């Protein structure tokens, strides 16, 4: 049986966002489920926009999500191989020279659109005479090269979309070699997939027309194309997720928002499938349940609040042994098991545990708030006797209402401020048992 090899091929021209991390996750999971390999390739032929800092950030995000790769390489290291295949395809008459300037191509595109026609290249360069070609050369124009698409049916069985069919005549022939001699993604990707024995490619459905063209490239190189799967696009408020849209970058989710790696991995691995989105604790367990056939053809709606809810579900499922190393990573190694189990149900982000610790162990300085000292003194006098429990808050506030007549915000806000120094935060009912009874009275009477 052929060994399954998948790949993830980001361009280091920006940060990873939720759309392409989903492709990375699914390629990794598919490979691991079938005891295959996962390759990380950097499509860095865009010299102007590719940056080392983006490459480093992409690797950091993948490592954070435990998407370890078996091999990695970048396209710039393979230029001599691309030249070899370029010459082969030129000999086969599957590449042809074009001399239009970017401005001329844009005028053609606008004219076609104004007539209600699809912006497909008109193959004008195929009909150039030697005299016309020589004239362009004398003008100093350098040719770019397009791949010649055969005008015939193209079809494949897609892992997600099922049977997909294209008419070669409906496809615009892509530029594969720029005027400066550098090569674009389209052909380089095919050469890499052949040389690295890629068997399966899972990517966004915005690549479907590229796949149709690349299938002809594989065939032109006498190679059977890999098996393709095209994911429906993720949308948020009726907008496609773009690489350049802020707020959906993985770095933002993990660093600024503070979400757990397995919450992010679980959510985006299952989003758009028929499987229930659950917080898995390991990539191995996630891979075991993974089924590419469960993914829908319809657009997938991404609601950030759903991801944050899943993060909460993951946190409340973690035992102390499962989280103590993570606590060290956020400099909260002082948290013990008893404290973790007490505050765990109220955590939205792991870093919230540090806020809880500070609330419970540091007497806040609230002198400047000018709180009602008489009211707080009355509240201290009716604090339930004995050990403070989760039920103490409701018992206490009922008694406070009986003696003061206060209710709602008028009742609880002064108590929250005196006890925590904050207007918002964890439920006071949950905070009380973590503070000594004597400390509660001290905070109320010294405010």
Curated annotation (Swiss-Prot):
Top EC group: ligase
First and last residue of the signal peptide: none
Entry's Gene Ontology BP terms: glutamyl-tRNA aminoacylation
Principal localisation: cytoplasm
GO cellular component: cytoplasm
Catalytic activity: tRNA(Glu) + L-glutamate + ATP = L-glutamyl-tRNA(Glu) + AMP + diphosphate
EC number: 6.1.1.17
Motif ('HIGH' region): 10-20
Pfam families in the record: Anticodon_2, tRNA-synt_1c
Family of this protein: Belongs to the class-I aminoacyl-tRNA synthetase family. Glutamate--tRNA ligase type 1 subfamily.
Protein name: Glutamate--tRNA ligase 1
Originating organism: Rickettsia felis (strain ATCC VR-1525 / URRWXCal2)
Underlying gene: gltX1
